[in-house]
C-alpha cells in the first residue's frame, strides 16, 4: 500500500484523523522517568502503546532525539521499529542540495524506515526529488507553518498577487505530486490559509499542527481542512496529549486526552 492508502485505511479502522506528535521534552516528562535517551524512548513507547487505536499516525520530531547524540538516534530507530499499527511520519523538515538530500532521504526511508517525512521546499524541486521518488512513502511539504514568524516569508506576495504559501501549494499539486505521495503542512493557527490551500489542493493530504498549546481552534480547523469525500486532514496534537499527566499514570491520561480529541474531531466533521 502507498502511504496515502495506509493513512486512509488507518483512519477508517480507528475512526480517527488525529495524529500524535512525539516531541518529548525531558523536563516535562513524568518525574519517575530519567531525563535521557532511554527515558525519552520509554515515554514515547508508552504513549504509542496507549493510543495506537485512536490515531491515524504518529509524528516523532527528530530534533528531540538528535539532542541526545548517538543514544537518541538509537532510541528513535527502536521507536520506529515498534510500529504498533499507525504509520510513522518523521518530522525532520529536510531540505538541501541534491547529494545531501539523497543522504537525508536514505536516512529517513532506508535507515530509519519512516513511512513519511516532512521536507522544506525553499531550495526548490531538486531538493525534494530524492524524497519524492520513494513512491510508496509520503512527503509533507512545509507550506504555511503554525509559528508566528511564518508571516516573514510565507505571506510575501508574488507579482501575480498570490501569497508564497499558496504558490507552494499549487507547485506541490502540479509539479511535485507525480506519485500521489505528496502532502502539505498547514498550521491550524492560520484558518484562512488552510481554506485557500484546501481549495487549491482538494485531493491532497494536509498535516495540520497548531491545535492546543499553539492556540488553533479545532472546529474552525476541521471545517477549513477537511476534503469533500474523505477528510484527508491529519490533525496533529503533541503537548496536550503528551503532558496530560506527569505521574505514573501518564499513558492512561494521554489515552483519555487522545480519545477526547478524536471524538471532538469526528463531531466537528459531522457538524460541517
UniProtKB/Swiss-Prot annotation:
SUPFAM superfamilies (UniProt xref):
Ribulose-phoshate binding barrel
* Reaction(s) the record says it catalyses: orotidine 5'-phosphate + H(+) = UMP + CO2
Show the GO MF annotations: orotidine-5'-phosphate decarboxylase activity
Q: Does the keyword Hydrolase apply?
A: no
Q: In which pathway does it act?
A: Pyrimidine metabolism; UMP biosynthesis via de novo pathway; UMP from orotate: step 2/2
Bilayer-crossing residues are none
Q: Which domain of life is it from?
A: Bacteria
Keyword presence, Lipid biosynthesis: no
Keyword annotations of the record: Decarboxylase, Lyase, Pyrimidine biosynthesis
Which SMART domains does the annotation name?
Answer: OMPdecase
Gene Ontology process terms (BP): 'de novo' pyrimidine nucleobase biosynthetic process; 'de novo' UMP biosynthetic process
E.C. numbers: 4.1.1.23
Q: Where is the active site?
A: 93 (proton donor)
Q: Where is the signal peptide?
A: none
Query: What family does the entry list?
Result: Belongs to the OMP decarboxylase family. Type 2 subfamily.
Q: What is this protein called?
A: Orotidine 5'-phosphate decarboxylase
Origin organism of this chain? Answer: Roseiflexus sp. (strain RS-1)
Upper classification of the source organism reads: Bacteria, Bacillati, Chloroflexota, Chloroflexia, Chloroflexales
Name of encoding gene: pyrF
Amino acid at each position: 500500500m502507498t502511504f496515502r492508502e495506509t493513512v486512509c485505511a488507518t483512519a477508517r479502522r480507528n475512526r480517527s484523523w488525529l495524529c500524535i506528535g512525539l516531541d518529548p521534552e525531558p523536563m516535562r516528562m513524568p518525574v519517575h522517568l530519567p531525563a535521557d535517551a532511554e527515558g525519552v524512548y520509554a515515554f514515547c513507547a508508552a504513549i504509542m502503546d496507549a493510543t495506537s487505536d485512536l490515531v491515524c499516525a504518529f509524528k516523532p520530531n527528530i530534533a528531540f532525539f538528535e539532542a541526545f547524540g548517538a543514544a537518541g538516534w538509537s532510541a528513535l530507530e527502536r521507536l520506529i521499529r515498534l510500529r504498533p499499527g499507525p504509520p510513522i511520519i518523521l518530522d525532520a523538515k529536510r531540505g538541501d542540495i541534491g547529494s545531501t538530500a539523497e543522504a537525508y532521504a536514505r536516512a529517513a526511508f532506508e535507515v530509519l524506515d519512516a513511512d513519511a517525512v516532512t521536507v522544506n521546499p525553499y531550495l526548490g524541486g531538486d531538493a525534494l526529488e530524492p524524497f519524492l521518488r520513494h513512491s510508496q512513502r509520503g512527503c509533507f511539504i512545509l507550506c504555511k507553518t503554525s509559528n508566528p514568524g511564518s508571516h516573514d516569508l510565507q505571506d510575501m506576495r508574488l507579482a501575480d498577487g498570490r501569497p508564497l504559501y499558496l504558490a507552494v501549494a499549487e507547485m506541490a499539486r502540479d509539479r511535485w505530486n507525480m506519485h500521489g505521495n505528496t502532502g502539505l503542512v498547514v498550521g491550524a493557527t492560520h484558518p484562512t490559509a488552510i481554506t485557500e490551500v484546501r481549495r487549491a489542493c482538494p485531493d491532497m493530504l494536509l498535516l495540520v499542527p497548531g491545535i492546543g498549546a499553539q492556540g488553533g481552534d479545532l472546529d474552525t480547523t476541521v471545517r477549513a481542512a477537511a476534503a469533500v469525500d474523505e477528510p484527508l486532514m491529519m490533525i496533529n496534537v503533541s503537548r496536550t496529549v503528551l503532558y496530560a499527566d506527569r505521574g505514573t499514570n501518564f499513558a492512561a491520561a494521554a489515552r483519555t486526552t487522545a480519545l477526547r480529541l478524536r471524538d471532538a474531531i469526528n463531531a466537528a466533521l459531522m457538524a460541517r
